[in-house]
């Protein structure tokens, strides 16, 4: 039996969605409402053979959700709201409370709101999206899917920071990790494509985009990941610095009189590829600048690759070897240059990339005799969310090959 499942990603001023037919995973419709709260909000809906765009005022998220449901009806995507069998919501932070996705209840929603102190930019609007859908579709089961849940299998040496213990025990400061939904989906897809149980593999997954994170996956479980207490830490990103010497921050604060909020702006929005290149946070723009002789742009590309290489190396040490390296995300899926730079001169690991396969974005890009598989796999977080709705709310398991 086919079920219509909606996957929702609510941002501070946007609402992204997909409506999927499950368990087959076919996209029925997808769309985005941008500039929520403005008089010129952009509404875009796409079905396999059609596209609709409109500009109109959208006051808030409740109005956005109402508009979305109205558009699905008016464009005959669905004939009634009762056709929507379940809704899955992406939630940024589940803290230590959620080790898996969870059915939405009053208690679940309250805990998501409480965890807003760990993700003040994301959890409040995620909770708002859940609340609005519950009001408008009160009989439709909902599931919260947490970016952090996949990383709850990290052991203490991998998640504890070397700070006074009370900062963990009282304030919950620890490595949480993010992009978990993507890492979980891509690693399962890898195992399926290899025809090998995920439980038998040691994998490093590189989710590379404007936000980037690396994840070590052993036996199907996350054992380490580069993002930490916040999505700011780890490798260099589009506008985020990733890991730096922490004493730089008080030094800058004293020298330039910056507030904590200004320092956060510096680290999150003015650093990374943009900060070093002085050109753009977009990897493609930095590539172009580097090719026209811009030294800072070329340096930014080198830094980006070297930080990732160092992280991969540490994870290989932790897992005692490597069976597969996987690239996903906007840069990981589309930039042959980035993949080549990250995999350069790793023959000593039994890892080598075939240039022709890499240039055409083949699924497997390793050379014929390479020991380590190198894969390029498109992530699909919306499908992963829909699969969790099926598993937890519709009581139909979609097999992903992920160990329990």
Curated annotation (Swiss-Prot):
Q: Give the highest taxon in the source lineage.
A: Bacteria
* Pathway where this protein functions: Polyol metabolism; 1,2-propanediol degradation
Organism annotation:
Citrobacter freundii
Q: Where is the signal peptide?
A: none
Extract the SUPFAM superfamilies matched here: Actin-like ATPase domain
User: Which subcellular locations apply to this protein?
Assistant: Cytoplasm
In terms of InterPro entries, this protein maps to: Ac/propionate_kinase, Aliphatic_acid_kin_short-chain, Aliphatic_acid_kinase_CS, ATPase_NBD, Propionate_kinase_PduW
Would you tell me the protein name for this molecule?
A: Propionate kinase
Q: Which PROSITE patterns match?
A: ACETATE_KINASE_1, ACETATE_KINASE_2
Give its E.C. classification number.
2.7.2.15
What are the UniProt keywords, alphabetically?
ATP-binding, Cytoplasm, Kinase, Nucleotide-binding, Transferase
Please provide, in alphabetical order, the Gene Ontology terms of the cellular component aspect for this entry: cytoplasm
The UniProt gene name for this protein comes to pduW
């Amino acid at each position: 039996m086919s079920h219509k499942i909606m996957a929702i990603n609510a941002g501070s001023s946007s609402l992204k969605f997909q409506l999927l037919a499950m368990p087959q995973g076919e996209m029925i419709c997808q769309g985005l409402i941008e500039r929520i709260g403005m008089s010129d909000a952009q509404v875009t809906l796409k079905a396999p053979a059609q596209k609709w765009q409109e500009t109109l005022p959208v006051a808030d998220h409740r109005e956005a959700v109402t508009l979305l449901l109205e558009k699905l009806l008016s464009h005959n995507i669905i004939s009634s709201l009762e056709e929507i069998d379940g809704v899955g919501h992406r939630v940024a932070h589940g803290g230590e409370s959620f080790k898996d996705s969870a059915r939405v209840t009053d208690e679940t929603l309250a805990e998501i709101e409480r965890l807003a102190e760990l993700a003040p930019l994301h959890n409040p609007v995620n909770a708002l999206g859940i609340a609005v859908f519950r009001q408008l579709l009160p009989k439709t089961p909902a599931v919260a899917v947490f970016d952090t849940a996949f990383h709850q299998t990290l052991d203490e040496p991998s998640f504890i920071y070397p700070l006074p213990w009370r900062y963990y025990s009282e304030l919950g400061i620890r490595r949480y990790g993010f992009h978990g939904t993507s890492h979980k989906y891509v690693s399962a897809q890898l195992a399926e494509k290899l025809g090998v149980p995920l439980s038998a593999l040691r994998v490093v997954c590189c989710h590379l985009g404007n936000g980037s994170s690396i994840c070590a996956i052993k036996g199907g479980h996350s054992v380490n990941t580069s993002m930490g207490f916040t999505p700011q830490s780890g490798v260099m990103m589009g506008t985020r610095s990733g890991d730096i010497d922490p004493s730089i921050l008080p030094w800058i604060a004293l020298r330039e009189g910056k507030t904590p909020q200004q320092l956060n702006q510096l680290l999150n929005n003015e650093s990374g590829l943009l900060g070093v290149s002085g050109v753009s946070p977009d990897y493609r723009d930095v590539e172009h600048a580097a090719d026209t002789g811009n030294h800072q742009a070329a340096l930014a590309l080198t830094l980006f690759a070297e930080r990732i290489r160092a992280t991969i190396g540490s994870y290989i040490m932790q897992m005692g070897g490597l069976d597969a390296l996987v690239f996903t995300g906007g840069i990981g899926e589309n930039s042959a240059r980035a993949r080549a730079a990250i995999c350069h001169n790793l023959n000593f690991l039994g890892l080598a990339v075939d240039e022709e396969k890499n240039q055409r974005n083949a699924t497997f890009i390793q050379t014929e005799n390479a020991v380590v598989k190198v894969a390029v796999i498109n992530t699909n977080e919306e499908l992963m969310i829909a699969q969790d709705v099926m598993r937890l709310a519709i009581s139909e398991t979609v097999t992903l090959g992920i160990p329990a």
